[in-house]
Amino acid sequence: GLPVCGETCAFGSCYTPGCSCSWPVCTRN
């Protein structure tokens, strides 16, 4: 998906609902 989740997952996980990690950023599923 598009990187619209506004957080990084380079050092952890995504916390925004409906988002997944596409290193190093979170992307909308």
From Swiss-Prot:
InterPro entries: Cyclotide, Cyclotide_sf. There is a cross-link at G1-N29 (Cyclopeptide (Gly-Asn)). Disulfide bonds join C5-C19, C9-C21, C14-C26. One of its GO terms (biological process) is defense response. It comes from the Eukaryota. It holds the Pfam family Cyclotide. This is a cyclic peptide. The presence of a 'disulfide through disulfide knot' structurally defines this protein as a knottin. Probably participates in a plant defense mechanism. This is Cyclotide vibi-C. It comes from Viola biflora (Yellow wood violet).
